[in-house]
């Protein structure tokens, strides 16, 4: 009974957010939801890591980010199949109540791998660089603050986009953000420990 009520509330909140659609914003959400458009940014992040940290520490932080991705993907797949929650775009109640669908797709909904991966990347690289800075600066440099702001902005947009394209419920996104943030933080701390052993 409790989880049924939680699911119903999640459906209604998702429908409310999803209803804030327009011909102007829909392409924006599709852009942020598309994995392929982020390839140039991934390349830029790798270049930034090596430039600012040196190749050894840069590769350590990169390894932390890759481990975060791997963990979030595997955790999402396991939980999705264990829970078996269908996506909003396949839910008769959601469709009947006007869900705006911008992307098709199968599989299960809980939890959002996009949200987990985007926040995992933001946390693992931002905290990883902050703690592994090659020059050991005591204060955070402006470029790193700008990087953190940009990464968390993008992560938020990616997460929200999953609701607007009709692929996930709000609850899927929130849980994905939490899991990705925790995983990213843990792997960033492990990377910083490894960096402390490198000269």
Which ranges hold each PLM region?
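Hydrophobic alpha-helical transmembrane segments
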Residues: 4-16, 57-66, 108-120
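Hydrophobic, aromatic-rich transmembrane alpha-helices
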Residues: 41-52, 126-132
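N-terminal transmembrane-helix/juxtamembrane module of multi-pass inner/ER membrane proteins
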Residues: 1-42, 76-106
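Multi-pass membrane proteins that catalyze or facilitate reactions on polyprenyl-/lipid-phosphate substrates
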Residues: 1-2, 58, 62-66, 188-199
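Alpha-helical membrane-inserting segments
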Residues: 17, 45, 71-75, 79, ...
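Membrane-embedded catalytic cores of phosphoryl/pyrophosphoryl-handling enzymes
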Residues: 100-199
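Interfacial segments of alpha-helical transmembrane regions
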Residues: 46-75, 148
């Amino acid at each position: 009974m409790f989880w049924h009520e939680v699911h119903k509330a999640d459906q209604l909140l998702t429908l409310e957010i999803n209803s804030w659609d327009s011909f102007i914003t829909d392409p924006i959400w599709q852009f942020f939801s598309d994995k392929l458009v982020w390839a140039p940014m991934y390349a830029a992040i790798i270049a930034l890591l090596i430039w600012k940290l040196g190749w050894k520490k840069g590769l350590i932080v990169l390894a932390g980010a890759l481990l975060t991705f791997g963990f979030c993907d595997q955790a999402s797949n396991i939980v999705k199949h264990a829970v078996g929650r269908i996506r909003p775009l396949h839910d008769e109640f959601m469709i009947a109540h006007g869900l705006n669908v911008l992307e098709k797709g199968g599989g299960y909904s809980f939890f959002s791998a996009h949200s987990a991966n985007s926040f995992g990347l933001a946390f693992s690289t931002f905290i990883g660089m902050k703690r592994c800075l090659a020059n050991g600066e005591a204060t955070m440099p402006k470029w790193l603050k700008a990087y953190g702001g940009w990464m968390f902005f993008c992560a938020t947009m990616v997460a929200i986009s999953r609701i607007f394209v009709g692929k996930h419920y709000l609850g899927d996104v929130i849980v994905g953000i939490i899991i990705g943030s925790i995983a990213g933080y843990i792997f960033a701390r492990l990377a910083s420990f490894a960096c402390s052993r490198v000269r």
